[in-house]
Regions:
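Conserved binding/recognition cores within well-folded domains
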Residues: 2-100, 104
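A cross-family signal for key residues in well-ordered alpha-helices
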Residues: 68, 116-117
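Short, charged, intrinsically disordered terminal tails
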Residues: 120-130
Length: 130
């Protein structure tokens, strides 16, 4: 008998930030993560690893692009080919990097403009309104 690893995502979106969640199913586990508890998602090949505010991690076999399409735009933003961040936790933005807690994340050129819009960066807003 063949044993195949499968993963399933179940979403429940609330009307406001903090009320939605994602349920991640692995081969032998299921874990519900509230959107408000997810700091970032890190992609590595065919896998995505969720990093929670309590320091826990959950890895599932979905590419980061699938996760980008699955997570709500009003909470999460892709900043690099390997990272999706909960933008509510971004502390610092310097040059081509952003910081959440003690960790710095690179910001790719393809994602910079959207990040500046989401963060309401004043200089970027003035340039885009011309």
């Amino acid at each position: 008998m063949e044993n195949k690893k499968t993963n399933t995502l179940i979403h429940s979106n609330g009307p406001r930030y903090g009320e939605g969640h994602i349920f991640l199913w692995g081969e032998n586990y299921g874990r519900r993560l509230l959107y408000v508890d997810i700091l970032y998602v890190e992609g590595s090949g065919s896998y995505s690893e969720f990093h929670a505010i309590d320091g826990s991690r959950v890895m599932i076999s979905y590419r980061l692009g699938v996760m980008e399409d699955s997570l709500p735009d009003d909470t999460f933003i892709r900043v690099h080919q390997s990272f999706i961040l909960n933008w509510h936790y971004i502390d610092t933005f310097v040059g081509n990097s952003v910081k959440i807690g003690d960790r710095w994340f690179p910001v790719g050129r393809a994602y910079r403009s959207r990040l500046l819009d989401v963060l309401h960066f004043p200089e970027h807003s003035r340039q885009n309104s011309k």
